[in-house]
Amino acid sequence: MKDFKLFLDLIRIKKPIGIMLLFWPCSWGLTLINDFSNGYSQYILYLIYFFLGATLMRSAGCIVNDILDRKYDILVERTKNRPIASGDISVSLSLLYVVILCSLAFLILIQFNFITILLGLVSMPFAFSYPLMKRYTYWPQLFLGFTFNYGLIMAWFSIKPEFSYIPIIFYFGAIFWTLGYDTIYG
């Protein structure tokens, strides 16, 4: 039971705002493109898929962040008790958790069309490199915006896999939204 609690601490399940910040752009993309005259079943199913995907990928992202920041986290009062920084969970076990979470997310991803699957796979390096941006740029919030709002594009293409300027415009608007909330948070 202690190990399970440590896992829940590791994925920050008690702080679900990160999940919602990843999920909301997905729901916006789905809502923008969905043809509600055909009913709601696909829309609701895709909302569920994107919510589960956001939960799994945010969880994996938290673990990767903690692995990459473990030497810094131990020095900061707010983060020194995180499971990896404190030594309660090993890096190797944490990596196993990341593989499991990403595998489960992939099982959800393959429920979509080929373009959406491809977009999801392309997003992986960006999702896991955000913690490094805090070290190498003065604008990590901008990188976070590009990464966290990518689901809007994926959701649009999951319904209509052809190019349109509409999701791009909303995507850039969402990036500015992220710049705002993450600047306030930081």
What kind of feature is each model-predicted range?
Residues 1-186:
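Multi-pass alpha-helical membrane architecture of UbiA-family
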